[in-house]
Amino acid sequence: MSGPLEGADGGGDPRPGEPFCPGGVPSPGAPQHRPCPGPSLADDTDANSNGSSGNESNGPESRGASQRSSHSSSSGNGKDSALLETTESSKSTNSQSPSPPSSSIAYSLLSASSEQDNPSTSGCSSEQSARARTQKELMTALRELKLRLPPERRGKGRSGTLATLQYALACVKQVQANQEYYQQWSLEEGEPCAMDMSTYTLEELEHITSEYTLRNQDTFSVAVSFLTGRIVYISEQAGVLLRCKRDVFRGARFSELLAPQDVGVFYGSTTPSRLPTWGTGTSAGSGLKDFTQEKSVFCRIRGGPDRDPGPRYQPFRLTPYVTKIRVSDGAPAQPCCLLIAERIHSGYEAPRIPPDKRIFTTRHTPSCLFQDVDERAAPLLGYLPQDLLGAPVLLFLHPEDRPLMLAIHKKILQLAGQPFDHSPIRFCARNGEYVTMDTSWAGFVHPWSRKVAFVLGRHKVRTAPLNEDVFTPPAPSPAPSLDSDIQELSEQIHRLLLQPVHSSSPTGLCGVGPLMSPGPLHSPGSSSDSNGGDAEGPGPPAPVTFQQICKDVHLVKHQGQQLFIESRAKPPPRPRLLATGTFKAKVLPCQSPNPELEVAPVPDQASLALAPEEPERKETSGCSYQQINCLDSILRYLESCNIPSTTKRKCASSSSYTASSASDDDKQRAGPVPVGAKKDPSSAMLSGEGATPRKEPVVGGTLSPLALANKAESVVSVTSQCSFSSTIVHVGDKKPPESDIIMMEDLPGLAPGPAPSPAPSPTVAPDPTPDAYRPVGLTKAVLSLHTQKEEQAFLNRFRDLGRLRGLDTSSVAPSAPGCHHGPIPPGRRHHCRSKAKRSRHHHHQTPRPETPCYVSHPSPVPSSGPWPPPPATTPFPAMVQPYPLPVFSPRGGPQPLPPAPTSVSPATFPSPLVTPMVALVLPNYLFPTPPSYPYGVSQAPVEGPPTPASHSPSPSLPPPPLSPPHRPDSPLFNSRCSSPLQLNLLQLEESPRTEGGAAAGGPGSSAGPLPPSEETAEPEARLVEVTESSNQDALSGSSDLLELLLQEDSRSGTGSAASGSLGSGLGSGSGSGSHEGGSTSASITRSSQSSHTSKYFGSIDSSEAEAGAARARTEPGDQVIKCVLQDPIWLLMANADQRVMMTYQVPSRDAASVLKQDRERLRAMQKQQPRFSEDQRRELGAVHSWVRKGQLPRALDVTACVDCGSSVQDPGHSDDPLFSELDGLGLEPMEEGGGEGGGCGVGGGGGDGGEEAQTQIGAKGSSSQDSAMEEEEQGGGSSSPALPAEENSTS
């Protein structure tokens, strides 16, 4: 045995003395004393009694003997007599007789020591007899020590006595190191975990644990004191399993029963502050529940009868808990570690593990060292997990199979980590025999370095060893050493894996990272494939988007993992379908004039979202272990997010939506609580009038223009987006993926096509060939490509930020006839494939057909046509009727609008679909009773229909029926981003909305004078915008539907900021009760009907640009709120009128109490705060000078003032008591920006270009947000006070 004790690896600090750890292979055959602690040894000191028995096979006993010999050389006569008794018992056990010293040196040494130990005054004869007796005992002990010396420590030419004494000294050091573990335990006694524990007596503890142990005869329980490390309780089964009497364990140190290589693992896994508390329930069921939830540790425990020549270690699975035990009635309760120990049997002996379940996994580094071993390997190989960690993989393989590892790693590199099966290999079990295993391998490609970070192996035992007891110690043999061929092969593999991965093959889900050159056609469409994709190319797109990932995650969560795997096995057929799709049974029956829509349709793209029960999709899948494992990790992360359970359930239902999934409970939720997670049935009506058979393009990859009904699948983005906020953990940007935005917001009339299409039929994206479609779902490549593309998209967004910010509505080209009306709607930019491409649409707009062109436009004014039908005639029960409110001029009277064209569709003002959020809606008695005729937006007379340059009416839209405007329910929620930490990222994307600023219908959008060229066309243009926006939202693809829902969230203006001051559609003035602003026009329709960006889930496309538009169109005299409808709630509140804020009472939070709670949490976490050791600090300080100063690097330590955006340090931060207290806690100064100023967001700075623009992305977002707020305050014209920045961030 050689080498230091690795106990510190399991946890805890390094020990001062170099503790010794024997090797893993005992040397049988050496005589050894009894393994169990006996009464004869109990009188010895704690350090020397049985402390050595915490070592492996032959080591523990030799250690104990060496301690006794060394102790006797420095102790008095009493110790000599005790040593004599022990030696006599050892002689009787080992049948050995004393012999004279082996050398004169040893003899003189022993003589000198005995003279010092036993000064005698009773005469020469008594002195000589005592000396002879001492020499005799010392030589006996030395001989016993030599017999226990491991073979590897016996070297030729070395003194056996010296080697024996050195070995004994090392054993003593280990015992002392073991004792320091207990001191560590006692120091952590005051941890909070030890405060709330139930106290048990020994009788109560035995009663509770007996229900455990009686269920499994291979299980016993033991309680170890954290203060002394001694056993205070052990169950009856321990004596049977360890073949010792129960009394033998009373008062013994538990670590002395463990194999030495397991001591460190045991202490590292039983830190008191990290252990669960033993439940208070007395039933075995409750205990079992806790038992299955906690992490176990594997250790070998010594056992065997006294007559055995040496100790035998048996493997156990220990599950630790912390509790308090009162040993006696008068004694105080002491914290103890309660261990439930279950013996591990060989998987090949009865009860055997079934052959099909003899599977385990491993993970090793590029240098072929085990990094992780599945605990299922223990009964199959005989090794405990800690035996293999850090050991070379090649050392355990058969010599003939070692060269195969080089070929395996080459294939891993070629396949970029893609899982693959390989021929069987032979693995050496602990008993020395080989196990034949079928193997599968995969690699994890680091997403940034593109190198293989580690290799995963999945192994299934094919042939069991001849000796089925894999825990049998191997035959005595020299300690295995690393052969030169093993070292050389490991170096070759390591050099091989240093190469970056270059492959176009799809990568594995479990992080087998992004590819260097993903194919444009066959690469799984990541969330940002659209960034560089050619939107105008009709080539076959990639088969899946990030939206599909979210849907698949919900399928797994709600349908079951196996069903999900089977559902992905076979691609559904590529069908052609009528626009109605599978939803004809539920599709707006009152709005379906075309009988062709009633034909049974072929399953469309929505079949991807159907439940996996479809028989054509059932097929076993080749999902690998890491794919399922990563899926499980994503699901666990989703469950940790604060998504309402109703929303999650809606997500599941929309993922597998069929005609029958509009369940009754969904219908019940219609009304004040809008249900937005439902599949939009009106999406089936997208091409209702011209029921032309259409092909469905596959979403993802390079998205071709999506038209009309091709969004059936993307309806799931209504709910799959709720999982995006959790899946963004894979990327750094707090926004939904670009392709998701495109899917949700794509409009057939605005997407640039390959060429102008004047055909009268609805424009359809060309159908890719069925061969190009391959259902991928949640695969490795989707997340990896998503990560890769998001990086580039994030940088591109900043590169184009200045140019997009400079765009003005005046520079927007007139829209094509029949599609674009009035100012360029924000919906246009939704078809761009990236932020960079969005500006192109201002310069070249593709003419679209004049036939039904359902384009999503802003709706700054309500439709001039009659209001929607009453609830009884509502085509879809889950749809919420909009709140019809008149818009009053400054003189207070409602203004009529010119009559709408006779071709206006019945769905002029359709009901919005919204996600299930609670909305507070004020009744309409706050306003004058509206007349039955439509309300107008301006008093300017309208002279005839608008010119074709502004728009061309859609002739296929008949007027809707009249209905009283009394629906009082409107979706009011603004959960666009719940955390102020995402404020700067939320504002980063606001600028691209510049082109939609004029049509945004802001609080005072129509108050200012319009350009003369637009004076006549403005009212009618707005009317048609309302009509087409409404029809588009009701009838177009589900991405526009989702856009409606999500934009409604963030654009509800004061409706959201004021918690429902008369509906999300209310304009600023009307929402606050100020009716003088005729400019409020129809922000009802605008905010509740035609929002086209997914703000609800973190995408922020528009508040900055809209702020400029609102400022330009607002007159100072108007009484409006200085905010833009798209702004987040904290920005709305900062600029809201006080009267509005009275209807939105934000819970008051005392800053002092909040800071006090934070300080208490910081104090509780202080002991767990990671700290660098002095050596680490010196080492880091030699490389980074800022480490020595305890500050951040200058490149990161950039702060900005919340008022001016400058780079000046915020002075208010230095005097803050919280920061001074943080310094007292010894925490690292990891401030991210402008202190408590609040407005600086995450980055906190205002970096202005160069390299800081890349490193301070968050700072840019913060400065853009500050500038947006500043612009609004200057141009809003309202005198309403703004809330402090601190209140903004707090709320």
From Swiss-Prot:
Residues 208-275, 348-414 form the PAS domain. This is Period circadian protein homolog 1. It comes from the Eukaryota. Homodimer. Component of the circadian core oscillator, which includes the CRY proteins, CLOCK or NPAS2, BMAL1 or BMAL2, CSNK1D and/or CSNK1E, TIMELESS, and the PER proteins. Interacts directly with TIMELESS. Interacts directly with PER2, PER3, CRY1 and CRY2. Interacts with BMAL1 and CLOCK. Interacts with GPRASP1. Interacts (phosphorylated) with BTRC and FBXW11; the interactions trigger proteasomal degradation. Interacts with NONO and SFPQ. Interacts with WDR5. Interacts with U2AF1L4 (Isoform 3). Interacts with USP2. Interacts with HNF4A. SUPFAM superfamilies: PYP-like sensor domain (PAS domain). It is found in: Nucleus; Cytoplasm. Changing residue 267 to E: No effect on homodimerization. Abolishes homodimerization. The keyword Endoplasmic reticulum does not apply. A motif (Nuclear localization signal) lies at residues 824-840. The keyword RNA-binding does not apply. The modification Phosphothreonine is found at residue 121. A motif (Nuclear export signal 3) lies at residues 981-988.
